[in-house]
């Protein structure tokens, strides 16, 4: 299986399967002399970790990260810093229940990658989906923590802005609310509605989709390159690579189809520090290059395909059959996708920052 690596100057390769011994990543291209400890990474992993509320999978994984290579004690200060060599990170799997999948090992789960993996490779890991499991995203979050150390001066924050038909009230957006509820929701009132709504979804054994918004602030103008290395193109590709993501938009995205040219164009005036934009419909990117405004991206995740209702499918022998999925699953995978989306945007920004330095100094 190829294509487990993304990025150009800041390159991330992830490895491991849902029910394997461990998962992890190798980050290549990180500059030297950046302070980096396991604690710097653990905080981000803890935000994504499963089993923290009744609204996420009850698989209990500590997600304790171990730095295997790429760091050493600074010869003068003694602080642990990056050396410029590949940084290998490993996270052990400790709570696999492969027996939960033995009854369906010869059946293709609707909505999952079972059929397509076997069609391509002639073999698939039925134990939790193997590489196609959202378990893989812990490695991305670990890499994103390193990326954040590269893009100093920039902040990348995400929020859940919609679950099913229920959206936040943007007038009530408060970043301080993110840590006060289990949804990464910036609207206190919406979080209360979601709690009752998702309880109903969870108890019925069903699932629901969601929309996540990621905002990067402090991004300097000039990141990205025209045509085939656009910043928004790479952000879109990075977010689309996350499990269950079915749509991405930058700025006002699809809503711009209903706007006139006068409404959509971000007008400009001279400000105290040079040209300033009067709006940000473009989401901080024009012509594939950052404008200096906040970079805004949203992505939609589908409902978790593993639900308790029996569904029609076929087996590996080509027979029609029914399937009932057991195991432990997220009723809304969008919740834990928030730190994953942040990580992917951080990695893309780190990559483009290093590419920008290499091209223009």
Curated annotation (Swiss-Prot):
UniProt entry keywords in alphabetical sequence: Amino-acid biosynthesis, Aromatic amino acid biosynthesis, FAD, Flavoprotein, FMN, Lyase, NADP
Record's GO cellular component terms: cytosol
Coiled coil: none
Pathway, per record: Metabolic intermediate biosynthesis; chorismate biosynthesis; chorismate from D-erythrose 4-phosphate and phosphoenolpyruvate: step 7/7
GO-annotated biological processes: amino acid biosynthetic process; aromatic amino acid family biosynthetic process; chorismate biosynthetic process
Keyword NADP found: yes
Group of enzyme by EC: lyase
Listed EC numbers: 4.2.3.5
Positions bound to NADP(+): 48, 54
Cofactor(s) annotated in UniProt: FMNH2
Keyword Endoplasmic reticulum in record: no
Cross-referenced InterPro entries: Chorismate_synth, Chorismate_synth_AroC_sf, Chorismate_synthase_CS
Reactions mediated catalytically: 5-O-(1-carboxyvinyl)-3-phosphoshikimate = chorismate + phosphate
Amino-acid positions noted as binding FMN in the UniProt annotation, renumbered to this chain: 131-133, 243-244, 287, 302-306, 328
Oligomer status and interactors: Homotetramer.
Function according to Swiss-Prot or TrEMBL: This reaction introduces a second double bond into the aromatic ring system.
Family membership noted in the UniProt record: Belongs to the chorismate synthase family.
Name of this protein: Chorismate synthase
Organism, scientific name: Rhodopseudomonas palustris (strain BisB5)
Gene: aroC
